[in-house]
């Protein structure tokens, strides 16, 4: 009996143990699978993070490389432009109203006034284009000399009668103007024993250039030569200093005439009535020496320039629009046969060249 029950119990224990063993196997398999998936996930996550980090680093690197390359490219472009492109001090013609629209945007009273002034030039005075002139303390002299050369205007009558190369020595030796050695060459601020020699060379250069331009009849060829000349800053500077000396010579000549009680133009009476320009020396020290350095030409200097070169300088003063001073001439009473050149200014300090 006991033997009969014993195998039965054994079979019952086997039947009850079989599910337990199967459950353990399933649990072990699931645990192993979970661990494997976790390991794979961690590896995948690490790989993704590594890839993202690499991608971010690559983006940052290429961004810096792009910025650096762009900076170097701009530098080289600027260098090549400076190296091979003419740095014109008188730019090419641009449409007048387009220039006005670009420079005088906005609705301030001054902007509105300037736009009306430019429209007046366009419609009433038939000025269609403008040449921008480099803004510095020589720009009035530059604007005048450019037009004299580009138009092929001849020497003033008094220059045809005298050798202007000898004017410095005439002042120094014939008229005893020893103070000429205090002449200052604009920003160079050079004074000393070599002033006489420098002035002579500069005046001779002016005579040579003027003669060459005056001898060319082809307008386009003169324009091409002007582009070459007015891209040479050193050469320009010498010509402007020569013009300043021509002005000083004329002031000295008229002053000598005044001392002998001769009739002189009214503009010179005004010049000599000022404490700061009562004679040629004070005019040079207080006014002319600063031109090209700390200031440009004043209105009375424009009168002297026009008188010295025997040209009628018509200036449209745009900031004086709707007043009697909108259009002025230097000098006010030029001779009929004097050639005319035109300038425009927005502030009486800087000048541009109108093109009709």
From Swiss-Prot:
Residue span(s) of domain OTU: 128-356
Ranges for region Required for membrane binding: 1-83
Effect caused by changing residue 139 to C: Fails to confer catalytic activity
Membrane topology designation: Peripheral membrane protein
Keywords: Cytoplasm, Endoplasmic reticulum, Membrane, Nucleus
Keyword Kinase: no
Highest taxon in the source lineage: Eukaryota
Pfam family, one: Peptidase_C101
Gene Ontology CC terms: cytoplasm; cytoplasmic side of endoplasmic reticulum membrane; nuclear envelope
Region of interest (Disordered), ranges: 1-22
Broad class of where this protein is predominantly found: cytoplasm
Compartment(s) where it occurs, according to its Swiss-Prot or TrEMBL record: Cytoplasm; Endoplasmic reticulum membrane; Nucleus envelope
Family recorded in the similarity comment: Belongs to the peptidase C65 family. Otulin subfamily.
Subunit structure: Does not bind ubiquitin or ubiquitin-like proteins.
Comment, domains: The N-terminal region that precedes the OTU domain mediates interaction with cellular membranes.
Biological function: Lacks deubiquitinase activity.
Protein known as: Inactive ubiquitin thioesterase OTULINL
Species: Homo sapiens
């Amino acid at each position: 009996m006991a033997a009969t029950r014993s195998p039965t119990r054994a079979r019952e224990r086997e039947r009850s143990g079989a599910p337990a063993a199967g459950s353990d196997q399933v649990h072990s398999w699931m645990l192993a699978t979970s661990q494997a998936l976790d390991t794979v996930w961690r590896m995948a996550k690490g790989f993704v993070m590594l890839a993202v980090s690499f991608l971010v680093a690559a983006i940052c690197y290429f961004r810096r490389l792009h910025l650096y390359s762009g900076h170097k490219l701009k530098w080289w472009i600027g260098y090549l432009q400076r190296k091979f492109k003419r740095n014109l001090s008188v730019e090419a013609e641009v449409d007048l109203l387009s220039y006005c629209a670009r420079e005088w945007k906005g609705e301030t009273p001054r902007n509105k006034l300037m736009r009306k002034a430019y429209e007046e030039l366009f419609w009433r005075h038939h000025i269609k284009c403008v040449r921008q002139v480099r803004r510095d303390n020589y720009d009035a002299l530059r604007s005048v000399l450019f037009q004299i050369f580009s138009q092929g205007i001849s020497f003033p009558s008094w220059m045809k009668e005298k050798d202007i190369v000898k004017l410095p020595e005439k002042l120094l030796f014939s008229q005893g103007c020893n103070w000429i050695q205090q002449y200052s060459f604009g920003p160079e601020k050079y004074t000393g024993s070599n002033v006489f020699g420098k002035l002579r060379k500069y005046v001779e250069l002016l005579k040579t250039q003027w003669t060459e331009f005056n001898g060319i009849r082809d307008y386009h060829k003169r324009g091409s030569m002007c582009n070459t000349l007015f891209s040479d800053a050193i050469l320009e500077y010498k010509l402007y200093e020569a013009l300043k000396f021509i002005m000083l010579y004329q002031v000295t000549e008229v002053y000598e005439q005044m001392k002998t009680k001769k009739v002189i133009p009214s503009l010179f009476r005004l010049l000599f009535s000022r404490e700061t320009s009562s004679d040629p020396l004070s005019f040079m020290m207080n006014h002319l020496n600063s031109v090209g350095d700390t200031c440009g030409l004043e209105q009375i200097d424009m009168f002297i320039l026009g008188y010295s070169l025997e040209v009628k300088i018509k200036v449209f003063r745009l900031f004086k629009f709707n007043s009697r001073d909108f259009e002025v001439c230097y000098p006010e009473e030029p001779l009929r046969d004097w050639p005319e050149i035109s300038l425009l200014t927005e502030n009486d300090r800087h000048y541009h060249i109108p093109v009709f």
